[in-house]
Amino acid sequence: MKTSTIVRKSFAAGDMIRDAGLKTPEDVQRFDDIVYGEDKVWQSLDVYRPKATNIEEKLPVIVSVHGGGWVYGDKKLYQFYCMSLAQRGFAVVNFSYRLAPESKFPASIIDTDLVFGWILDHAEEYGFDTENIFAVGDSAGAHMLGLYTNLCTNPEYAKVYKEKFGIQTPQDLKIRAVALNCGQYHFGLEEMSNEMTDNLMKEFLPEGGTPEELGLVNVDTYVIEKFPPVYL
């Protein structure tokens, strides 16, 4: 049995218990299932705002990158967490992205980039303050967000991704700060000796985790001074 299958079954059982009986808070306004790419299922997002605010009122933005070992999860599983952030005065963007092994790296990074571009393009429509964009990532989402933040701040790293994958982050995007929860930020010999990590990387990466591939997804290697403030 694939590791991704095991992860999906085990994680789903716990998530169902956690979310049982939860409902949308009365003080949150939500805009659901907005398609940001070609895949209407996996490339979709929700926007949550405090209901007491007018849509014309620009609010600071929090972008949530969900976890799930790169192989599991979607925006539905993080909706209640994200709505709790909206209750604190933020416009929150909660998105699904394409998962491995069906969609190999860099699909999830491409999707993350599309979402940030979508935010800039729809700032007026949804009341986003693009001068105050923050982001949170959980587990695999923390790894992806760390990687993406490197692409936004490290020109040499960004050049590699542009040449290899055609990814180019929006020039006018500035992420003010990030919060990274329970992520893995380096994939060396010690880390890859963990059977689950090794198996997940084999499903996540197109060539199964060659040294070159692992080097490209190491977050800590490419952090420079321009990296924004981070809460770990």
Predicted ranges, named:
Residues 1-232:
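Alpha/beta-hydrolase superfamily serine-hydrolase fold, recognizing
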